[in-house]
Amino acid sequence: MTDKIYPILPLRDVVVFPHVIVPLFIGREKSIAALDAAMNGSQELLLVPQRDPAVVEPTLADLHEIGSLGRIVQMAKLSDGTVKALVEGLYRVHLEALNDDEKMFSAKKRNMLEKNSTKSEEHDSIVEILIEEFAKYLRNQERSADELLETLRGINDIGRISDTIAAHMDFRIEERVHLLAMEDAYERSQRLMILLAQESEKNELNKKIKNRVKQQMERNQREYYLNEKIKAIQKELGEMDEAQNDIELLEAQIKKAKMPVDVEKKALSELNKLKQMSAMSSEANVIRNYLEWLIDYPWAIEKPARYDLEEAARILDRDHYGLEDVKERILEYLAVQKRINEHNQKEAGTIGKGPIICLIGPPGVGKTSLGKSIAEATGRDFDRIALGGLHDEAEIRGHRRTYIGALPGKIVQKLCKLGSNNPVILLDEIDKIGHDHHGDPAAALLEVLDPAQNHTFNDHYLETDIDLSNVLFIATANTLNISEPLLDRMEVIRLPGYTTQEKIQIAKRYIVPRQRKENVLKASEFKIKNGVLNDVIEDYTREAGVRNLEREIGKLARKSVRRLQEGKQKSILITPNNLKDFLGVAKYHRNDEDLQAKIGSVTGLAWTSVGGELLQIEGVAFSGKGRLTHTGQLGDVMQESIRTALSVVRSYLDDLDDNFRFDEYDIHLHLPEGATPKDGPSAGIAMATALLSALSKQAVRGDLAMTGEITLHGKVLAIGGLKEKLLAAQRGRLKMVLIPEDNLKDLDEIPEEVKAALEIVPVSHIHEVFDHAFVADHAPFKARIEQKSLPTVSAVMHETPAGRC
């Protein structure tokens, strides 16, 4: 900061940038006094924008703390007492020690350091883009500034170019002050590019609107002239209006469509309106489209549905391997529907309220194909509606007819397309519905998926109730991240991931034959040796489903086709030895070092939208002051779990060793893959084990994984997603998994193959976790642990249900 005091010239609606000369008209007394003071001195003054341009008599609080040091180039007093001045901005300044002596404002300045973080290789490109976008802006504004553009092309300083352009733009005062406050020329140029792009987009939109309005006016005048001319010709010739034939056809179709009485009445009313209109008018087209949608809707067209349970079981077994629990639940559902149909509840005056199925599981486990199989088993039509990213309620309920280009909702559109009112409609990715100011599609689906209400579903476009109770809706999702009211209307059926042996059988029975067919390969031309599929699964996919497995087998088939076409071989045999030649280097390595015992390294288990995953937890302890650091993009619940685990371990170590000083150590806990968000409480025992290992310098078994929520007293609580987590442990070639004792009941759902591959140990307390986690070489340490027990508290506390990690 300099000691020199400069007069302040408050500016309204003007920001003076460095290296830019700006004309100013000054009429306020304090402003004129500031000009006079500058002229009597060094001709320099502080050019400071006001926070609110509407303030006529500003105070110091009304001024920004950022401005420009300016130099008066020229000044002239006008006859009305005002002053015209030409000022040049010199450089950015920060105001210090502001003062108001009633005559004028004054302040000291601190020069703002001009920085430039632009990479040298980007410099020329940024300059070119800035000038090009500015030229485009000037053209849109119909302003001629060839001389200014030539001047800019002669400047090689990004900061100066940005300031010059900003000075000639019509930005809001806040944006200009923001640009003035930015010391880094590179950041200033990036912000300016965004503002220029926004201005260009706004100008283009204005042009489109003007052109559209102009064209509409011309079109309306032309239509009016032609309609009047046609009427005159028809009157002279006495011919019938050609549109009459279309109206008669529409009337016949309305009567043939077997609409409900109230709907047919409304359709005929709209038809009468159409008769009174010119066929060329825009409103006539709106009514005609509306009537066509009413006619196309299958009001009374119901495809005969069959409920042959044996045939349904055959189709499900044909199309899907495994998933026995899922198939059984689907057959139960079809049996109930068959019984409802046999008792003909609708004719008895009641409505069958069969549940809506929601298939939940990771990608590639067969949710969509199960929907197709159900449709085939029941003899119904099938279609799917992709809900992922849907954010407009009108996509479900339809648009009001008053909107240009209005259409019915997706459900009505699908029913019109299929031509029957009892199809199977798959609502795909229901957990990925969005919502914004257009409404909430999930709320609109509440009526669609409620069997007690969907017989009177109202589509905004059709403006009438339609019966959706005959439609069999099946929803799919990767997670239970669905609104509670919507989830309450559906029965959830989980599709867990496949075991390795199940994937091998799926590949042999479905994927390999399908890839042979798609790539026109004979069985004798394309063979896969035993063991190859296992290598593909272990080294190239590692997923809960089989989607990537199909991609890799497809890659094998395509490369085989190429070799056959080149004439190098007459048949291709894929073996473990030549697999790398077809698929390249393995994406996942089976490294025995990962299974070695390490200090502070523990393998947890996570349950995600794509199935189970291994969760690596690393901890280190070093000299410090008892501070805890955790990294890896952890959610709030997981951070609380870490703090709980730390309290358990501190209590444990205090009880184990009275001389242990926790405040002499700092601890850093890290979960790798920091770009991936992680949350949930079920890694609690893994966190505690990692912390104890880091503090005690004792190694943890590398072939062991664990999952379970921990309480402050060391109790291990139940978790969710056990099957998915055990499948992940099997894929990771681990030998032992510690699970909460309360989850023992869930082992009945675990495939025998998984239980045979893993030693699954139930634990109820952190003592038991430590007993199994630390390697046998540290038996003395384990013995000391066994002799101690955590202090207990007599009060009984209710624990919340475990979440999932």
Curated annotation (Swiss-Prot):
Q: What class of enzyme is it?
A: hydrolase
Q: Where is the Lon proteolytic domain?
A: 596-776
What does the record give as the reaction this protein catalyses?
A: Hydrolysis of proteins in presence of ATP
Q: Which PROSITE patterns does the protein's record reference?
A: LON_N, LON_PROTEOLYTIC, LON_SER
**Which residue spans adopt a coiled-coil conformation according to this UniProt entry?**
none
Per the entry, induction is: By heat shock.
Entry-linked SUPFAM superfamilies: P-loop containing nucleoside triphosphate hydrolases, PUA domain-like, Ribosomal protein S5 domain 2-like
Subunit info here reads: Homohexamer. Organized in a ring with a central cavity.
Q: Which PANTHER family match?
A: ATP DEPENDENT LON PROTEASE FAMILY MEMBER
Q: What is this protein called?
A: Lon protease
**Native source species:** Dichelobacter nodosus (strain VCS1703A)
- State which gene encodes it: lon
